[in-house]
């Protein structure tokens, strides 16, 4: 099914075949970027970032510029009419006429879905509260495929803030749809994966899940370690954050029993949960992950805008 004109609010809107198409095209663009330098000439991307972002916003902007398009938008709600009380619906009704595609990040869960109800151009969810982050999921999938050559028969460990981590929630729900996946959840008891999400994944996909508070317990078994930071901005209590912020710090000592082809990933930004000494380990792929995010977003937007039909 064509992605032309379609919104992307939740990665589960995409079939496995569509996910494969986006990833395949993203890797093709990554290998041959010059072939795609002007495919979006005359196209405008609108960025609506009501919440701080470095990688997601700049990755989208870089992606559009690398395809010959242009970008307009805001990176702080305080510099937009939202500060004056303008509704999301009214903002979308206006910007819908200014751009060919809109990407929105918002602290409120469901805001991009609401926006999509008023837009005639494609809306992409750039992250909504602790809910979903579909293009980070695409970034994660292209990184896994690029390094493992497959997305199946893998044991994936998620570590850190599994309660509020929208990148974890999006990726978990999507990976659980692929064949023969196993998951390990590593977190403090205060930041465990939401029960409804765990139950949904188990019930709908019959996957094997293990929960633990110990980072090293399953290190020798896992194929992918997905680290996340403890998110200070999600806490209402400073004391609780201070108590939990150093729960997990990955260093070379903790990797001593890990597989030689372990894939260490992180959606970034990193605080202190991965020691800098790990950066030079060949298994550390989080900076490559951020780089590949540009190319998978190029692929997504090209397909949504209809400048490419499929790979």
UniProtKB/Swiss-Prot annotation:
The keyword Transferase applies. The keyword Transferase applies. It comes from the Bacteria. L-aspartate binds at residues 84, 166, 229. It catalyses: carbamoyl phosphate + L-aspartate = N-carbamoyl-L-aspartate + phosphate + H(+). PROSITE patterns: CARBAMOYLTRANSFERASE. GO terms for molecular function: amino acid binding; aspartate carbamoyltransferase activity. One of its GO terms (biological process) is 'de novo' UMP biosynthetic process. Its EC number is 2.1.3.2. Pfam families: OTCace, OTCace_N. Keywords: Pyrimidine biosynthesis, Transferase. Catalyzes the condensation of carbamoyl phosphate and aspartate to form carbamoyl aspartate and inorganic phosphate, the committed step in the de novo pyrimidine nucleotide biosynthesis pathway. Heterododecamer (2C3:3R2) of six catalytic PyrB chains organized as two trimers (C3), and six regulatory PyrI chains organized as three dimers (R2). Belongs to the aspartate/ornithine carbamoyltransferase superfamily. ATCase family. This is Aspartate carbamoyltransferase catalytic subunit. The gene is pyrB.
